Amino acid sequence: MLLILRLFTLVASPADLGPDESQYWFWSRDLAFGYFSKPPMIAWTIGATTALFGNSEWAVRLAAPLLHIGAAVFLYLTAKQLFTQRIAFWAGVAWLTIPGVTLSSFLITTDALLLFFWSGALFFLLRIIQAPSPKLLDFAALGAAIGFGLLSKYAMIYFPIAMVLAMVMAPPVRRTVLRPELLLTASIAVGLLIPNILWNVANDFQTVAHTAANANWGASLFKPGNLLTFIVEQFAIAGPVFFGVFLWVGYRQWRGFSKVTSDKTTINALIPFALTPLVIVCVQAFISRAHANWAVAAYPAIIMLAVAWLHEHRAAWVAKATVGAHAALTLAFVLALSHFSTVDRLGLASAIKEIRGWEEQSHAVAAMAAGYDAVMIDDRALMGAMLYYERGTPLEIVAIDPNASISHHYEAFKAFDPDKHKRVLFVTTRSDDNHVNYRFKQITPLGPTTVSLGGDQMRTYHLFDVAEFFGKRQR
């Protein structure tokens, strides 16, 4: 029922594609082994769903709720191995209703892919740990899950790190997992990643460099306020009850990890898969910054541990009540995404501004583009929106680099070409011509184009007629 509700909402929602989503869609038009800011799996996935169902917004996003259902199935199967069928059922349901997954089910992001493959890898690893005689197929499947996870988001690298920690801290896990068959796991994972590595080599390590730049270690460092913000955000992603219970469980179990008995080894083995992403990203948040979703890989283990602890301590009703509260929140999301007017009346228009107004804004700019060789844009968000919403037109849409360095995919692969684009309609977030006045001799302001995003939220771009390029050519 939850899947049907989410699919219906995707189809019925007036939400436009957001900046990242439209960029991923653009990537899917030209399938490759890598892209500027992400590995290729997101583009391959969108390419598959749009090939089957067309290019509507819901078709672009279709994989998101399906992937989370798949992750829930893996969590159910994993929890069933470790605990009871009842705990497994509630772990799967809890997963589908936590706020972070609810939001992620309505948008196409790399997180949905990462969580699916992470949950699959966790399932196959626990099968290996628990089996008296592990099967070669499970080692192969583990390698495939890790490899495909790395092709989805490089944060999958936390998984092998957590594996090593589990083997170091729990000798029974080490004896079960550290076998010759593990070479097959590593070979498959690395083999799947090699095409992406080669793509990075051929393209100046763009994805790797972008990922490193996101860490922002070149700015002022050591920001405890950012760490506190990140921790508070984790309570919002999993819900305060489940995340709070996990912190208590993690504290208790981690203290006694070395004394764990053999029948509890597999349960304790989950903890590194929760703490590894959390601790690494907490350090990153303290040093510089971290987005709320950067530790999202921790949550499959977090939810299983929290639900199991509540059931085993006669507090199953707390888990069920929390799921009920999260389900109510899901219904609120459905209402908000189906009826933007409700959001506006509540004064929350700013919360959804990233998925509103792009189609209208794109068409407004396109209406001004007659007679120009191209529309030239200095903003990644509008660039993606116009490529998506003007896809059925012959309009040429190109990016111009405003800061003498390649900042996103369009600047690298959809750049302004002065040999082809003699007279262009320049669209900018700035009200002045500072991004072009040292490159073009002829510049005529044409005024702004503004769209309403609900409430008092507005989005404005400024248009200029520019020609006679004389500046430095982009790479």
Residue ranges of predicted features:
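Short helix- or helix-capping micro-motifs
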Residues: 2, 91-99, 146, 150
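Hydrophobic/aromatic-rich transmembrane helices and adjacent perimembrane loops
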Residues: 31, 104, 237-240, 244, ...
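Transmembrane-helix motifs of polytopic, lipid-linked glycan transferases
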Residues: 62-83, 120, 124
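Transmembrane-helix signature of polytopic, membrane-embedded enzymes
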Residues: 75-97, 116
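Membrane-interface transmembrane helices that cradle and orient dolichyl/undecaprenyl
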Residues: 80-86, 121-138
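Short acidic/glycine- and proline-prone juxtamembrane loop motifs at membrane-interface regions
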Residues: 100-114
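Transmembrane-lumen/periplasm boundary regions of multi-pass, lipid-linked membrane glycan transferases
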Residues: 148, 160-267, 273-277, 282-285
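Membrane-proximal, lumen/periplasm-facing interface regions of secretory-pathway glyco-
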Residues: 292, 316-371, 380-410, 426-474
